[in-house]
């Protein structure tokens, strides 16, 4: 995750929280209260906030239903201005009979990769013994041959993600992998990063 450059400066202001569809289409800006976040470099980040079921119109003074309140549900996204997109988890509903609000946790968008899996994923093992179905001649990143590019092969099952920059000294390196079943996120962050001695920076905005 790329954090805003002014995060620790005096010019930093509270970011807008915008409710979005799963395709990142904006729905509306949320009146989020108790907004807080835990931002990490080597794992997905987390934010939390509350949204009340009603709000007070500043012009008329009337109490009105919060627009799209029912749309605040698990799997939809929010865009946290300057930070990126986050996937909503199922909110908790609180009510005292008079006031009602939803308490929401959301994880940075790369979290969705923990819900997609690689199965029988065998790379550079050769068809020897019990190892059948290996894709050989694979390097970390080959933009001219996606069938022999590890990053392309992994992201085939990760809709909406593309590959940005890969350091030249890493791109042509080759390693072997054999995965029975593992989430794409765990494979990327554990096996791949540890094996290639690299790190991944997820850009959820672009």
Question: In which residue ranges do the predicted regions lie?
Answer:
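Short beta-strand and beta-hairpin "edge-sheet" elements
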Residues: 76-107, 201-203
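Juxtamembrane "anchor/assembly" segments of surface/extracellular structural proteins
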Residues: 1-70, 105-114, 119, 123-141
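Short amphipathic beta-strand/extended segments with alternating polar/hydrophobic composition
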Residues: 27-34, 86-91, 151
């Amino acid at each position: 995750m790329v954090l805003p450059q002014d995060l620790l400066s005096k010019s930093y202001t509270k970011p807008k929280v915008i409710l979005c569809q799963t395709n990142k289409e904006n729905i509306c800006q949320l009146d989020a209260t108790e907004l807080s976040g835990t931002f990490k470099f080597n794992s997905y980040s987390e934010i939390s906030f509350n949204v009340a079921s009603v709000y007070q119109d500043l012009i008329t003074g009337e109490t009105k239903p919060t627009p799209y309140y029912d749309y605040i549900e698990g799997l939809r996204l929010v865009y946290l201005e300057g930070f990126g997109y986050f996937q909503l988890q199922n909110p908790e509903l609180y009510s005292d009979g008079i006031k009602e609000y939803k308490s929401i946790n959301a994880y940075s968008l790369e979290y969705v990769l923990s819900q997609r899996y690689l199965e029988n994923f065998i790379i550079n093992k050769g068809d020897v013994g019990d190892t059948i179905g290996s894709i050989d001649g694979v390097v970390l990143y080959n933009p001219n041959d996606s069938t022999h590019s590890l990053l392309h092969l992994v992201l085939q099952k990760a809709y909406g993600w593309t590959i940005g920059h890969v350091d030249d000294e890493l791109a042509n390196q080759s390693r072997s992998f054999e995965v029975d079943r593992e989430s794409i996120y765990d494979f990327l962050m554990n096996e791949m990063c540890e094996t290639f001695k690299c790190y991944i920076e997820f850009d959820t905005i672009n």
